[in-house]
Amino acid sequence: MPHSNISRAPRQNLTERVLQAKTAKNLTWAGLAEGTGLSVVYVTAALLGQHPLPEAVAEVVAERLGLDRDAVAELQTIPLRGNVEDVSSDPTIYRFHEMVQVYGTTLKALVHEQFGDGIISAINFKLDIKKVEDPEGGERAVITLDGKFLPYKPF
């Protein structure tokens, strides 16, 4: 039976334990997700408190991290999502806010022009990030946001 949290505290506490264990054991997000059948993005988001994990996956990652049975149960609990209550001052997260501030109206206009009136789902959604070489030197981040379009329906 699925259970859910009504506060962020349980998952935030577990996230701290996950991060401590990951650091102490020198693990990577990709290594934690390996063999689970889920993407590294989904498993990372779950371990950072944003998604529940299926029981078998929760057991695998908890074992890799050295976490107890209570952690396995909490990893399966539906979290209270969205832990950013205001604009983060973390430079990496802030850049995403900045991208939306600069390009948000452009994205909205292009989505509506190409799809009509509606939204892009963050529920039926996939996220991917890849590091690629920049032909001008250095590296670039290619971030793919793949969400189902959901049209508004008159009623």
UniProtKB/Swiss-Prot annotation:
<comment type="function">
    <text>Catalyzes the reaction of cyanate with bicarbonate to produce ammonia and carbon dioxide.</text>
</comment>
<dbReference type="InterPro" id="IPR010982">
    <property type="entry name" value="Lambda_DNA-bd_dom_sf"/>
</dbReference>
<dbReference type="Pfam" id="PF21291">
    <property type="entry name" value="CYNS_N"/>
</dbReference>
<comment type="similarity">
    <text>Belongs to the cyanase family.</text>
</comment>
<dbReference type="InterPro" id="IPR036581">
    <property type="entry name" value="Cyanate_lyase_C_sf"/>
</dbReference>
<dbReference type="InterPro" id="IPR003712">
    <property type="entry name" value="Cyanate_lyase_C"/>
</dbReference>
<dbReference type="GO" id="GO:0008824">
    <property type="term" value="F:cyanate hydratase activity"/>
</dbReference>
<protein>
    <recommendedName>
        <fullName>Cyanate hydratase</fullName>
        <ecNumber>4.2.1.104</ecNumber>
    </recommendedName>
</protein>
<feature type="active site">
    <location>
        <position position="95"/>
    </location>
</feature>
<feature type="active site">
    <location>
        <position position="121"/>
    </location>
</feature>
<dbReference type="Pfam" id="PF02560">
    <property type="entry name" value="Cyanate_lyase"/>
</dbReference>
<dbReference type="InterPro" id="IPR048564">
    <property type="entry name" value="CYNS_N"/>
</dbReference>
<dbReference type="GO" id="GO:0009439">
    <property type="term" value="P:cyanate metabolic process"/>
</dbReference>
<keyword id="KW-0456">Lyase</keyword>
<feature type="active site">
    <location>
        <position position="98"/>
    </location>
</feature>
<dbReference type="GO" id="GO:0003677">
    <property type="term" value="F:DNA binding"/>
</dbReference>
<dbReference type="InterPro" id="IPR008076">
    <property type="entry name" value="Cyanase"/>
</dbReference>
